[in-house]
Amino acid sequence: MEVDPQLRFLLKPILEWLDDPKTEEIAINRPGEAFVRQAGIFTKMPLPVSYDDLEDIAILAGALRKQDVGPRNPLCATELPGGERLQICLPPTVPSGTVSLTIRRPSSRVSGLKEVSSRYDASRWNQWQTRRKRQNQDDEAILQHFDNGDLEAFLHACVVSRLTMLLCGPTGSGKTTMSKTLISAIPPQERLITIEDTLELVIPHDNHVRLLYSKNGAGLGAVSAEHLLQASLRMRPDRILLGEMRDDAAWAYLSEVVSGHPGSISTIHGANPIQGFKKLFSLVKSSVQGASLEDRTLIDMLSTAIDVIIPFRAYEDVYEVGEIWLAADARRRGETIGDLLNQ
């Protein structure tokens, strides 16, 4: 692969990390800083590069694979000259003045089978039959706070246990405010990717990327929530947080959770868990992907995806948390989330 001399020059500030065999990932979320992942941990590092430098890296790296990268084509999955995989996100899919470059460094070494036990935690590999018992143990920890009526401890446990939470209520009911509160309880070392159509969420975590999709496919470089989800899965997220649920974002939400990224915190319109779930079901079913699924299949997917539905309402100057639907509570009653459709 012929390497542009300018690209080689622009990559100099990160060559030390790229050449280090301990490096697994380099995440550049904005000018001036990078997060380098080694031994499974991201460490924040200073990076003397400007916005223009990052944009040039993106354009030149895309050109290596004959991909036109820019405002009209702001997403690109490509490779660097050394074979490192690169996910590019440029404005308008990220806020103006920022660029997201996520570099995954391939391992140059192939491990033998005799190293499996030292490289992997395989303590549960033959424990399929005990998975229900483990589920019950996990449920008990959450249910203890639920049954004790300790809302603060319950919400904290939901967040740190990576339960997928759906907040429902009418406009102005406090659901977005609560989502910001819950996000602040996510452990600070986690890498967060948000997918929104407007910048509503507040993310206090250092290592985060804000991804933006266009409403109704309008605007320059218009991308869908589904496009952003596909990109985010190549960006080593600990959690993917979807903003308000609407249109094709609902399918992206479901795809995100079932792809192995639980712990999302999202909002949807609906006065109570029944209406909130029916709204989610309707949104997913109205998507191109959801329309091709049988109702039973879709309900089963949602049953594995949604752990908590929290309703909100406001009256006068009071914000109220209503009756929470909890999957663990439903399981002990012999119910599933699908039963909400029949109420």
Swiss-Prot record:
UniProt-recorded Gene Ontology molecular function terms: ATP binding; ATP hydrolysis activity
Post-translational modification: Autophosphorylated.
Compartment annotation: Cytoplasm
Entry keywords, A to Z: ATP-binding, Crown gall tumor, Cytoplasm, Nucleotide-binding, Phosphoprotein, Plasmid, Transport
Binding sites annotated in the UniProt record for ATP: G169, P170, T171, G172, S173, G174, K175, T176
A biological process from GO: secretion by the type IV secretion system
One Pfam entry name: T2SSE
Keyword Acetylation set for record: no
InterPro entries: P-loop_NTPase, T2SS/T4SS_dom, T4SS_GSP_E_ATPase, VirB11
Annotated Gene Ontology cellular component terms: cytoplasm; type IV secretion system complex
Family, per entry: Belongs to the GSP E family.
Function field: Required for the transfer of T-DNA to plants. Couples energy, by means of ATP hydrolysis, to T-DNA transport.
PANTHER family cross-referenced by the UniProt entry: TWITCHING MOTILITY PROTEIN PILT, TYPE IV PILUS RETRACTATION ATPASE PILT
Full protein name: Protein VirB11
Upper lineage: Bacteria, Pseudomonadati, Pseudomonadota, Alphaproteobacteria, Hyphomicrobiales
